[in-house]
């Protein structure tokens, strides 16, 4: 019964969550066990049902030796469902990983290190970048959980997330009332995402803790629209 009431409260509070902002840019600090690893910038652009999500990484301190990274996801949002069309992940010193989603033909094409493979499009397919954006649509949907088949250009993994409550959090750019989602069914690590209603439920904090206790956390340092 309490779970049903929790879901009802989240649903009522997020009735307008399905429409992303036309533009929002967030800069994060990524830390590992409290030490700064990188500055991460995420830029979302959305118009007429089409989105483009671009993420860039710049290593800090010792991690600057690892260079930089850039990922991009392009696709559509139809009836509250996010459908990526193209994805790439390019990093210093590595081959670029790519994925193409053909929703009409129901095929997924992935390419890495010169090898390209085609396979049937799995259920609720997302890419490594788009699935976090897709989570922002969950509070406005008819369910409190969702499972994604996530492609990164090299392979597929299955992730299930569930809305677990509301929480007020403190960040370097202020305090926010959030809806919290947690990954389910993974014994290797815990993953939690805090979605900000103030910004159309875009993820504003991420925390991953592996089985050895290593903490990877991402917190915002700048938000602009």
Residue ranges and their predicted role:
Residues 2, 13-14, 212:
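Alpha-helical transmembrane segments and their juxtamembrane interfaces
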Residues 19-103, 137-225:
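Acidic, serine/threonine-rich low-complexity disordered tracts
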Residues 1-2, 50:
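Intrinsically disordered, low-complexity regions enriched in Ser/Pro/Gly/Gln/His and often acidic
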Residues 9-18:
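Hydrophobic h-region of N-terminal signal peptides that target proteins for export
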Residues 2-8:
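Sec-dependent signal peptide recognition
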Residues 93-136:
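Hydrophobic, well-structured mid-protein blocks that either form specific transmembrane helices
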């Amino acid at each position: 019964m309490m779970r049903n009431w929790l879901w009802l409260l989240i649903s009522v509070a997020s009735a307008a969550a399905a429409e992303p902002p036309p533009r929002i840019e967030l800069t994060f600090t990524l830390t590992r066990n409290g030490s700064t690893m990188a500055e991460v910038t995420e830029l979302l652009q959305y118009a007429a049902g089409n989105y483009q999500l671009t993420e860039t990484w710049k290593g800090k301190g010792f991690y600057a030796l690892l260079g930089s990274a850039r990922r991009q996801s392009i696709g559509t949002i139809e009836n509250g469902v996010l459908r990526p069309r193209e994805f790439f992940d390019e990093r210093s010193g590595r081959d670029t990983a790519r994925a193409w989603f053909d929703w009409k033909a129901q095929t997924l094409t992935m390419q890495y290190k010169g090898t390209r493979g085609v396979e049937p499009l799995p259920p609720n397919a997302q890419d490594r970048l788009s699935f976090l954006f897709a989570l922002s649509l969950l509070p406005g949907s008819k369910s409190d959980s969702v499972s994604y088949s996530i492609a990164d250009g090299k392979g597929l993994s299955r992730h299930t997330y569930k809305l677990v409550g509301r929480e007020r959090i403190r960040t370097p750019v202020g305090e926010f009332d959030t809806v919290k989602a947690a990954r389910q069914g993974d014994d290797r690590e815990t993953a939690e995402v805090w979605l900000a209603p103030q910004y159309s439920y875009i993820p504003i904090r991420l925390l991953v803790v592996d089985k050895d206790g290593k903490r990877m956390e991402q917190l915002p340092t700048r938000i602009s629209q």
